[in-house]
UniProtKB/Swiss-Prot annotation:
CDD domains recorded: SSB_OBF
Region (Disordered): 118-232
DNA damage in keyword set: no
The protein's name: Single-stranded DNA-binding protein
Transmembrane segments: none
Keywords: DNA-binding
Listed GO MF terms: single-stranded DNA binding
PANTHER family noted in UniProt: SINGLE-STRANDED DNA-BINDING PROTEIN
Segments forming domain SSB: 1-111
Superkingdom: Bacteria
GO cellular component, one term: nucleoid
Length: 232
């Protein structure tokens, strides 16, 4: 909104159906005229009398223009909010004319004497929810790359690997880049390559008191198999 704009709100009736046109660039614009007629009560005659009507041309653009063309018809009582504009032009006879128009910011039916049913139009679907196309999930980094734990490239611990991972390249609960606990190769043993609940990736050593870290090498006896459980 430019500085110095004259904001105006007008309640009136459409004198004709809106006219929808498109500019060469493809932008939609709808033009319609409304008549706002004041009414006063004459106590002498005990009747309502109409005053001089105010006629204004209204211009509305883009998506709202298409909605206006599909929703409003001649005779409907509407509420128009916008900016008052003065425009001068010259007729074919060479006479100069000045008219006032409203650049519409918002418009809708008046419900004082009528009912209306609103049909909401979705705007840019998939921009939210549980990890929709533009984020909005629990830990999603946008769209199908977030949302549920361990999915694709997100989850609860994306970028730093699970709950305790230090370099777990985009893991979930335990997924390296595949979602299921077990890193890149889907292993379920003690080698969580990229992520997991405590996996530090290939770049972080486990503490000395870690029972998995203190196990003898696989195949040398004891409890050393990669798929064996450590003693407690």
């Amino acid at each position: 909104m430019a500085q110095g704009d004259t904001n105006i709100t007008v309640v009136g009736n459409l004198v004709a159906d809106p006219e929808l046109r498109f500019t060469p660039s493809g932008a939609a614009v709808a033009n319609f005229r409304i008549a706002s007629t004041p009414r006063t009560f004459n106590r002498t005659t005990n009747q309502w009398e109409d005053g001089e009507g105010l006629f204004l041309t209204c211009n509305v653009w883009r998506e709202a223009a298409e909605n206006v063309a599909e929703s409003l018809t001649k005779g409907m009582r509407v509420i128009v909010q916008g900016r008052l504009r003065q425009r001068s032009y010259e007729t074919r006879e060479g006479e100069k004319r000045t008219i006032f128009e409203v650049e519409v910011d918002d418009v809708g039916p008046s419900l004082k004497y009528a009912k209306a049913e609103v049909t909401r139009i979705p705007r840019g679907g998939g921009q939210g929810g549980f990890g929709g196309n533009q984020g909005g999930g629990f830990g999603g980094q946008g769209g199908n790359q977030g949302g549920n734990p361990g999915g694709g490239q997100g989850g609860f611990g994306q970028n730093t690997g699970g709950f305790g991972g230090q370099q777990g390249n985009q893991g979930g609960f335990g997924g390296g880049q595949g979602g299921n606990p077990g890193g890149n190769q889907g292993q379920s043993g003690n080698n969580f390559n990229q992520g997991g609940f405590g996996g530090g990736g290939n770049q972080a050593a486990a503490p000395d008191n870690d029972p998995w870290n203190s196990a003898p090498p696989a195949g040398s006896g004891g409890f050393g198999g990669a798929d064996d459980e450590p003693p407690f």
